[in-house]
């Protein structure tokens, strides 16, 4: 099928595919409990209950690990916005609705587990963490909200294709964060979360592939738009750019990882450059996609140069941005108004 379909028509056409992949997801998902991966015996009361409040010396995580863990947590915290956006695009009926609710339930556990780990292990300032979490959820994640002016999803194919890349990127970020923690408990926790994210990615990736078979030109338009303007959902977090630099320089997630481990594998799975069913604007956009990839390659090269400059500067001056400094919220948070 190559005729243009409305979102409602596409939802109907893809319903059997969604039901098939939902059942596959349920059969592949391995149950796990977040509380099993929190070192509760390491915890102790804070001042309000007669204990001691947080001190920076109590954190056993590196600056990179602290920044990455907090960024991952506050990104997961914005689940109310993600649920709204996905529900608006995919609907709440039938297999689509069952998937939206199942996905939301699984994602909700990730934020709970990450917050428990950080607070129990005293890895970061819990007061600053709560201020940041409130701010991030208040800012939300929605096209045009708070005059952000950033692209998200305007159609069903926009939404499904975007999360195909985003879930894979999140899986890799979580897994690399676990390794950066240098703590076997954190590594196990992040491995469990990453496994969930991988199954989410597989679901969206394969539903997207079915969309390419049904409406190749529509899907190609979405693909070109997404890769040209891609941003991780945590872009609205205060000090995002500075935190992203720390995470990238630390090897958790950088432009090269994004291109080689996220973008290219998904494009290969969808056979974007081998397909022969693109016509008109779809064919033109597919050709232009090669230029988008070239731009991503250039971004990788520029990042490596910038990374080396920063490392040289830190070695020369002995100064580097600390996680504690980045997570201080004073003067950075202004609760957003709609």
Swiss-Prot record:
CDD domains: Acyl_ACP_Desat (cd01050). It is found in: Cell surface. Its EC number is 1.14.19.-. Keywords: Fatty acid biosynthesis, Fatty acid metabolism, Iron, Lipid biosynthesis, Lipid metabolism, Metal-binding, Oxidoreductase. GO terms for biological process: fatty acid biosynthetic process. The gene is desA1. Coiled coil: none annotated. May be a desaturase involved in mycobacterial fatty acid biosynthesis. Is a major B-cell antigen. Was identified as a high-confidence drug target. SUPFAM superfamilies: Ferritin-like. Residues 314-328 have a biased composition (Basic and acidic residues). Belongs to the fatty acid desaturase type 2 family. GO terms for molecular function: metal ion binding; stearoyl-[ACP] desaturase activity. It comes from Mycobacterium tuberculosis (strain ATCC 25618 / H37Rv). Binds 2 Fe(2+) ions per subunit. Pathway: Lipid metabolism; fatty acid metabolism. Homodimer. Fe cation 2 binds at residues 107, 167, 197, 200. One of its GO terms (cellular component) is peptidoglycan-based cell wall. Residues 314-338 are annotated as: Disordered. Gene3D superfamilies: Ribonucleotide Reductase, subunit A. This is Putative acyl-[acyl-carrier-protein] desaturase DesA1.
């Amino acid at each position: 099928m190559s005729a243009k379909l409305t979102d409602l028509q596409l939802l109907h056409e893809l319903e059997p595919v969604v039901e098939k992949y939902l059942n596959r997801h349920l059969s592949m998902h391995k149950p796990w409990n977040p509380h099993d991966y929190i070192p509760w015996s390491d915890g102790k009361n804070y001042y309000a209950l007669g204990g001691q409040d947080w001190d920076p010396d109590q954190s056993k995580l590196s600056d990179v690990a602290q920044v990455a863990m907090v960024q991952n947590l506050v990104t997961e915290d914005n689940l109310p916005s993600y649920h709204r956006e996905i529900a608006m695009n995919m609907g709440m009926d039938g297999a689509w609705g069952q998937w939206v609710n199942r996905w939301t339930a699984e994602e909700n556990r990730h934020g709970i587990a990450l917050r428990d780990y950080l607070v129990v292990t005293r890895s970061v300032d819990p007061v600053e963490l709560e201020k940041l979490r409130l701010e991030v959820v208040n800012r939300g994640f929605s096209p045009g909200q708070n005059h952000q002016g950033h692209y998200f999803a305007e159609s069903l194919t926009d939404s499904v294709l975007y999360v195909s890349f985003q879930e894979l990127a999140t899986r890799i970020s979580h897994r690399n964060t676990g390794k950066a923690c240098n703590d076997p408990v954190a590594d196990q926790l992040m491995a469990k979360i990453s496994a969930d994210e991988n199954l989410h990615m597989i679901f969206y990736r394969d539903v997207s592939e079915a969309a390419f078979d049904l409406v190749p030109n529509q899907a190609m338009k979405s693909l070109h738009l997404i890769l040209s303007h891609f941003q991780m959902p945590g872009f609205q977090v205060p000090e995002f750019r500075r935190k992203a630099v720390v995470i990238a320089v630390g090897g958790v997630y950088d432009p090269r990882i994004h291109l080689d481990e996220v973008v290219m594998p998904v494009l290969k799975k969808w056979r974007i450059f081998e397909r022969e069913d693109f016509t008109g604007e779809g064919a033109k956009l597919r050709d232009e996609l090669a230029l988008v990839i070239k731009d991503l390659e250039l971004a990788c090269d520029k990042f490596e140069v910038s990374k080396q400059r920063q490392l040289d500067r830190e070695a020369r001056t002995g100064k580097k941005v600390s996680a504690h400094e980045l997570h201080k919220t004073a003067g950075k948070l202004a609760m957003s108004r709609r």
